[in-house]
């Protein structure tokens, strides 16, 4: 099973961003890469919402829950689901 750092690296590699970009949070600006990393940490690693929030500098665990909900909605989009599959497969 992949660690949290491996998940972050895989997401950053696919989105071609630096890991620091995952921790940047700006009000009303979506960060698809961060949301996906959060989702993977929750469902691949089984991390607690509070711990994930700490890793991404999110002060409220409900922000983590909202990110997970956004990914669940996006997974209905074929292109996003394909991207998710590539990243997920690269972890194992």
Question: Can you annotate each of these PLM segments?
Answer:
Residues 1-36, 40-92:
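Basic, alpha-helical nucleic-acid-binding regions used in initiation and control of genome expression
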